[in-house]
Amino acid sequence: MMDELSEDMAKGNGEALTTYAVVLGVQPQDREHFAAVTHEHFSEIFNKSDATAADVYANTQAILKQDARLAKYAEQA
């Protein structure tokens, strides 16, 4: 799953990326924006070649919190 997600995020679309958005609770109207933002910040989300699911999740949360439209989907810490 991580390989598929990284490939989809790198290109900005795909089934794994859509599934990730759904798991995070991103509503359909915001999924295109989610794909664009995660694509733009790919190197920050997958910041090392051996990134774990926990790394990717934490990095995604950090990116979501920085985006006005997507912040509502970030986990409240």
Question: What is the role of each PLM region?
Answer:
Residues M1-A77:
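Mature extracellular/secreted ectodomains of secretory-pathway proteins
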